[in-house]
């Protein structure tokens, strides 16, 4: 008596039995309106289909979908840059979920337009309308190139900055715009510089004060009706700290950078206060928070500081993600 062939659900078995379910894709199949209308839609699920607590969700949506977007520089040049986009909306307690593809489609409907604060507001309104939600938020992150000249030789090179534009539209109709900006600089320790000079002066011993690559992460909120450019944020950082890391250098530039660091010694506390002074003086900026990290070459830990403008109901100094400032 022959043994019955054992079959599998999706694959032909080793004994030669055909699968119980045939897998195929029909590239010629075309969807018509009637077929589309027959497709199940989870948005139509009953209230009882909601799993877990029947409570609102503050943010639900999509993160890190990529799109080439157009950005205008302060000089008027249009740059097309790869952007990583996060878009979220609120979800009321009686709804199971949202149609996330509608958020993505909202961006594609406007992908050929130049990015502006108004563009962000238009996108937020569109996906509030498309998803039928009450609060919306988006964040567009990208690497922004700026051409800089070296300190003395005249060489030029591109510095790339981690930048993000963020927009928030609340159910009260408030629209808030933020710019996130990372600035990498060198910090030479004032204490170490003094001790090095003491060794040279008192004992004739040459020594090198410690300095290190450092990063400031700035987030600013634009004043209503005002426009602040990425280049403005960079200029504030450069005026405050002076010692931005260099791109293209010759020996004269390296020497100049050593002199520049000597002229602008700074603790991490100094960096925070210097930046505060610059950003606080700009009327186009309603609020800000600054986090600094000096990646100490003396210690096996980093020195950090956080400062905010102090606006009532605005930013607080609750930043703790210092590991993200490693550069």
From Swiss-Prot:
It catalyses: GTP + H2O = 7,8-dihydroneopterin 3'-triphosphate + formate + H(+). Converts GTP to 7,8-dihydroneopterin triphosphate. Its EC number is 3.5.4.16. InterPro entries: GTP_cyclohydrolase_FolE2, GTP_cyclohydrolase_FolE2/MptA. The record marks 189 as: May be catalytically important. Belongs to the GTP cyclohydrolase IV family. GO terms for molecular function: GTP cyclohydrolase I activity. It comes from Opitutus terrae (strain DSM 11246 / JCM 15787 / PB90-1). One of its GO terms (biological process) is tetrahydrofolate biosynthetic process. This is GTP cyclohydrolase FolE2.
């Amino acid at each position: 008596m022959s043994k019955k062939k054992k079959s599998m659900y999706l694959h032909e078995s080793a004994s030669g039995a055909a699968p119980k379910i045939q897998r195929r894709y029909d590239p010629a199949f075309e969807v018509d309106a009637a077929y589309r209308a027959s497709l199940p839609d989870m948005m139509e699920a009953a209230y009882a289909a909601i799993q877990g607590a029947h409570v609102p969700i503050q943010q639900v949506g999509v993160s890190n979908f990529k799109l080439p977007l157009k950005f205008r520089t302060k000089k008027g040049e249009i740059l097309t840059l790869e952007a990583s986009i996060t878009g979220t909306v609120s979800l009321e307690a009686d709804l199971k979920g949202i149609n996330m593809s509608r958020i993505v489609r909202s961006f594609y409907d406007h992908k050929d337009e130049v990015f502006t604060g108004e563009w962000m507001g238009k996108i937020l309104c569109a996906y509030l309308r498309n998803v039928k939600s009450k609060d919306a938020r988006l964040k567009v992150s990208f690497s922004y190139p700026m051409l800089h000249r070296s300190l003395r030789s005249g060489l030029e090179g591109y510095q790339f900055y981690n930048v993000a534009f963020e927009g928030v539209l609340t159910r009260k109709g408030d629209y808030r715009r933020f710019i996130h900006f990372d600035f990498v600089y060198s910090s030479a320790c004032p204490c170490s510089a003094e001790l090095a000079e003491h060794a040279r002066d008192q004992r004739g011993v040459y020594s090198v004060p410690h300095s290190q690559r450092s990063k400031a992460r700035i987030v600013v909120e634009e004043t209503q009706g005002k426009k602040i450019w990425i280049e403005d944020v960079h200029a504030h950082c450069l005026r405050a700290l002076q010692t931005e890391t260099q791109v293209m250098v010759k020996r004269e530039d390296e020497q100049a950078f050593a002199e520049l660091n000597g002229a602008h010694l700074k603790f991490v506390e100094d960096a925070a206060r210097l930046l505060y002074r610059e950003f606080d003086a700009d009327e186009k900026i309603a609020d800000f928070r600054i986090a600094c990290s000096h990646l100490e070459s003396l210690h096996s830990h980093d020195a950090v500081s956080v400062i905010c403008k102090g606006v009532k109901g605005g930013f607080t100094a609750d930043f703790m993600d210092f590991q993200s400032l490693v550069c």
